[in-house]
A protein has these predicted regions:
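C-terminal/domain-edge helix-coil "capping" segments
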Residues: 1-14, 32-33, 38, 42, ...
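Generic signal for short, ordered secondary-structure residues
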Residues: 17-18, 55-56, 109
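Second-shell loop/turn segments in exported
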Residues: 17-27, 60-64, 119-120, 163-168
């Protein structure tokens, strides 16, 4: 059998800071940064650094928090030379938080993947939800460790203790 060792060309992606509705800007930026970090951990895409995005936006006289339309995101994506952009909304309704994120083609504007979740609890719990959505938005299975964390469990090693009487 011939093994194809041609390097896989990774899709290039940039993530804009999410839009916050009922959540303060620092929390939105922290949660967006968690998604950036976790998407980097997936190794499924080539991620553009936040600083590069900020530089392009500064040159264009745009603020990340003000670039909430798909048109603005696509324009930034073209300037960055990326294939895909990820943007989204973090919202608060009563005691619930919502996360809606999508990855779309800069060239066509077509949404290639959309994910969302609703979370009830303290805002810190959204950090884990952002990690889980990061895997889903790039089309990969969520690692068991994250599923366990969501279920309130931690990874525990499995052990067996066997008595040997040593008498062969």
């Amino acid at each position: 059998a011939v093994i194809d060792d041609t390097p896989t060309i990774l899709r290039t992606v940039a993530i804009l800071d999410f839009e916050g509705k009922g959540i303060n800007l620092q929390e939105v930026q922290t949660l967006t940064e968690r998604m950036r970090t976790e998407i980097g951990n997936t190794k499924a895409v080539r991620l553009i650094e936040r600083k590069a995005i900020e530089n392009i936006m500064a040159e264009q006289g745009l603020a990340q928090s003000g670039c909430v339309t798909d048109e603005c995101a696509a324009e930034v994506g073209q300037l960055l030379g990326v294939q895909y952009m990820i943007n989204g909304i973090l919202g608060k309704m009563g005691d619930s938080y919502t996360i809606d994120a999508k990855m779309f083609s800069v060239e066509t504007g077509e949404t290639v993947q959309a994910v969302n979740t609703t979370y009830e609890g303290e805002i810190e719990g959204l950090l884990l939800e952002m990690q889980i959505l990061s895997w889903e938005i790039v089309g990969l299975d969520v690692p068991p460790r994250l599923k366990l964390q969501r279920a309130g469990e931690t990874e525990k090693p499995t052990m067996a203790v066997i008595d040997f009487d040593g008498r062969g």
